[in-house]
Amino acid sequence: MGKEIKMAYDDAGDILDISIGDPEEAISREVEEDFFLRVNPVSGEVVGFSILNFRKWFKGSKDIKTLPIKAELAVP
């Protein structure tokens, strides 16, 4: 069975965190300016990603942003 996608937004830090499954300890790797993949340091599995300066990137924008990652999703 797949894992749920969980999101949290830190207004003070202007950071959107998206976790695949429950949030867990991870190493962050910047893949583009302000876009970070979170990787489990033991398994190497991607466990989420973070977007810094979220308002800067998305407020008032009608542009679609593309991250350099691929995902497989399913509806239960």
Positions of PLM-derived features:
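Small, basic N-terminal interaction modules of short regulatory proteins
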Residues: M1-P76
